[in-house]
């Protein structure tokens, strides 16, 4: 039965988290591995088993070529694919694999089907990236009710129980992206005033700095560049990440990687000591990259640092002391420490899910578009229709005209960004409006309307006001996914889910078969004298049949279950035979010794042993249970003519 709960998902670069409203409070959901966060990692093993999350991360050193990490950094990129198991996948598809696991684990935890989700994205994600994220959710089987900016979600988690009016700044440094947002909170209204960020800055870059340092030191000492060896590079990656984490609480750490490579003289080991001071000097340029967006967000909001009442840190990378110190130096405010940086975004997404589901009252979220939107006009200029930091949803229109005489069509090219030259911004899409009656240049009036919905997704329409002809476009994700393509990917994802389920059932069948063989061998060995020769031979034949099927890698679940059931029947026969023998022995003993007081307990003890054996022989089922068209802008006087 489907639940009416809406799952809040923080789909992160390195780790993801998910939560749901339980009563009046959001609650993080523990995944199948018992963890509160799930690594955003996907892998394919040699036997074509797909791994997602912690199992995928755990095997990355042995299988670096078939392990995908930080796919979020490529969301919305056209023509970008990764190869897994001989097949190419888009970032949307890989992200959907992660979301599938999240969906499955949440349903297992809650005991209900989950159909709807709120998924968060970096505030500085453009339209392509937002649409790509929504597509990923739909591929995974979710109805994506809302796309929410990560800093906004975090502010909701922070301010849920706070009725005071205040201005907060959310500094969100995750694994692959950086965002900063300024919000006004009060009376249950969360209003984003300004946002800024860098989609190419995150904890991965701190790791890369340590990797480069380690590889450089090793090359200086041994003349070998470990970055040319995929497996060694992956070991460096894991060691760098671990060192970064350790240096958040320690002054120095030792990085020890034995047998990192080999030469003609034998194996070579890596051992380096990294101090926090050295680490911070290696990454000083990275932390400085967060200063510009932070100052710009304050400027766009019209605030000074003294206007900020609270600073919230979001994202695991904000645990680094240099980050906390930089934020405090920059804003003059000590960041709050009562918000879990790994969980705040998911909790806020769950709160927004509760609002949409009608479970949470008196909360209004007023988010903004992070970048300006407009079209290319004559001379390649970028003409803005919607400025950055405009509250969404919103709609704006502007009238343009043709730049050439007798122009019967115009090409509308939609861009997003802050550069004055259109081509230097992000091209979101383009479409053609035809059927414009021939007329002198500057005569036709073409109204262009931009609409941004609550998810930050853009629809653009152009209408020739003379003829009434109109065309429109909804900006698609990075792969330009149509409904049909999304449906196809959903089917592929579901097919993989069924395949995974079949694999699980087959493994469980094999486990039951192996257990039955082990029980049979134990029974034959321990009760050889109590089993007649015919039954013993029959059981040995059944064991051989089971072992033969287990040796066949192509054996189906049904074939395995058939031979296991046959063996289990024979084992039950053993139980019956031995029970009868025990009964007879008990009766004879009673006849010889009379109704002695010790006979009853002796018989009961034997019956207890038989009961255990009978249970073991029939426990196969129990195991399973556990188991161009240039444009000219028309000025206001022209519009009125």
UniProtKB/Swiss-Prot annotation:
CDD domains on file: ASKHA_NBD_HSP70_DnaK-like
Which parts of this chain are annotated as the region Disordered? Answer: 488-527, 585-641
| Composition bias, Acidic residues | 622-641
Task: Identify the keywords attached in UniProt to this record, alphabetized.
Answer: ATP-binding, Chaperone, Nucleotide-binding
- Pfam families, alphabetized: HSP70 (PF00012)
- UniProt cross-references to InterPro entries, sorted A to Z: ATPase_NBD (IPR043129), Chaperone_DnaK (IPR012725), Heat_shock_70_CS (IPR018181), HSP70_C_sf (IPR029048), HSP70_peptide-bd_sf (IPR029047), Hsp_70_fam (IPR013126)
Q: Please list the residue ranges that the record marks as compositionally biased, kind Gly residues.
A: 588-618
Q: What would you give as a GO molecular function for this chain, any one?
A: ATP binding
Composition bias of kind Basic and acidic residues appears in 493-511
The similarity annotation says: Belongs to the heat shock protein 70 family.
Give the protein's biological function.
Acts as a chaperone.
Q: What is this protein called?
A: Chaperone protein DnaK
* Organism expressing this protein natively: Haloquadratum walsbyi (strain DSM 16790 / HBSQ001)
